[in-house]
C-alpha cells in the first residue's frame, strides 16, 4: 500500500516523510543510499502497534541536498525540526548504518527527547584513517560513474550466502539507491567521513540502547560491535547469525519481532535496566 508522503521545510528546503499508525512514536532512519521506502515491510508490521515515522534524510529520497557536506549533526537537526513540527516530545529512534550515526548525533544534541535508540548495523566510533581514505576513493568513483558504484555497493552489503535467497531484496535496495543524486551521495560520504567518536553518548545514555548485529556484516565486523556493546548500561543485543548489513531485508521477521520487544520494554513507565542478548538464525 502506497503511503501518503508529506513535506516540511528545513533551512528553506524540503524534507520528505511518512507518518502512519497510532500510539507511542518510533522514528525509522534509513542508511546511506537508502530512503524511507526501504522500511516498507518493517513499517507495515510495526504500525499495527505503534506510530511509525519514516524520513528521507538530506540528500536521499525526495529530500533536498544542503551545501557540500551532510554532517551527522545536520541530519539530526532535520529530524528534530520534523518532530518539533509534529509537536512530538518523546520517541524512540531506529537508525540503520548512517541513520545510526545520525541517531547518535541526535542523542548528543537532544537527549531529553529520547525513550530509547536502536543502532541497526551501526557504530558509535568515527571512521579510521583507512576508512576515511576509502570514502575519499568512493567520492572519486561516484563522480566517475555513480550508477556502477551504487549498484555494487548495495549488492556487497548483503551476506554472500543470502544473495540468491534475497535476489528481490537486493534489486529493491538497488532501485532505491539509484534514485540518489550524485550530490547527495558525495555530501553523505563527506559527512560520514567527518563524524566524531560518540562512545560517551552510548556509555552515559539514560535510556535503553538496542544493537542489531549481522555475523556476516562486511562493513562493521561482528566482534567489534559486540565489544562496543559492553559500554552500554541498559542494552538489548540482537545477533543475526546468517545475515550481513541489511538485516531488515535479509531477515525481516526476526528483526520486527525483537524491535517490538525492545520498544515495549523501553516504553514501560518504570523500566529496569536491560541486559538482553538474543540470537536469530
Where are these regions (language model features)?
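Conserved HGGG/HGGXW glycine-rich cap/lid loop of the alpha/beta-hydrolase fold
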Residues: 9, 13-68, 72
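Conserved acidic catalytic loop of the alpha/beta-hydrolase fold
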Residues: 74-91
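Alpha/beta-hydrolase fold catalytic core
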Residues: 1-26, 47-50, 84, 89, ...
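Conserved alpha/beta-hydrolase catalytic His-Asp/Glu region
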Residues: 126-133, 144-204
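Catalytic histidine-centered segment of alpha/beta-hydrolase-like enzymes
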Residues: 243-252, 256
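Short beta-strand/loop motif that positions the catalytic acidic residue
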Residues: 205, 211-213, 217
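Conserved hydrolase catalytic core segment
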Residues: 88-128
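Catalytic histidine neighborhood in serine/cysteine hydrolases
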Residues: 226-245
